């Protein structure tokens, strides 16, 4: 058994489910960067789209059960925190999904297995695959298990926007405001992927990816803050 196959088997043990549809699991773990030369039959973009909705339903349901007297305005920021890209990436790391992913050689070489956008997308795709393979009850069980440690963090409310935090930090250092530039756009129109560069005078620029320009800018701002030891 090769290293990736072992990682996939470990992931199934970790979530407590062996997929009946092996192609479905493989699809959920295949990133769009994998090219035709790697015998790709598809990637996880559509499953990611479905998984985002499955995750939203399960998170909303779980919050409503935990806080039966809470109003919509109180639940909304908690829901946003539970389904955020940062949270999904953290959950994927906790489940050790990275080694199980199929990436292009170039994406793997530059650390794609630890990239928030790739990990978060894989976590969403996995939820869709679980829903399709075993139904909503299975997806709910795995969600409650993998996201168990995230509910306390969600109760703290919505974190500061990374771009706002970076702007405030730059000003506190006596620097001009950060600048953002789109360096690349790839993928189909229904599921584009943007690469954005953020620059603060006097510092090396940082690059990040996202499914929208705004998402990529936030990811880049967050990465720069973390690199400079000023995380939000």
UniProtKB/Swiss-Prot annotation:
Boundaries of every DRBM domain copy: 161-230
EC numbers, comma separated: 3.1.26.3
CDD domains: DSRM_RNAse_III_family (cd10845), RIBOc (cd00593)
Catalytic activity: Endonucleolytic cleavage to 5'-phosphomonoester
Listed InterPro entries: dsRBD_dom, RNase_III, RNase_III_dom, RNase_III_sf
Chief place of localization: cytoplasm
Cofactor requirement: Mg(2+)
Pfam annotation, one family: dsrm
PROSITE patterns: DS_RBD (PS50137), RNASE_3_2 (PS50142)
Chain ranges passing through the membrane: none
Magnesium recorded as keyword: yes
Cellular component, GO annotation: cytoplasm
GO biological process, one term: mRNA processing
Binding site for Mg(2+): 48, 124
Positions of the RNase III domain: 8-135
Active site, per annotation: 52, 124
Subcellular location: Cytoplasm
Family the entry assigns: Belongs to the ribonuclease III family.
PANTHER family: RIBONUCLEASE 3, RIBONUCLEASE III
Protein name according to UniProt: Ribonuclease 3
Organism encoding this protein: Caulobacter sp. (strain K31)
Gene of this entry: rnc
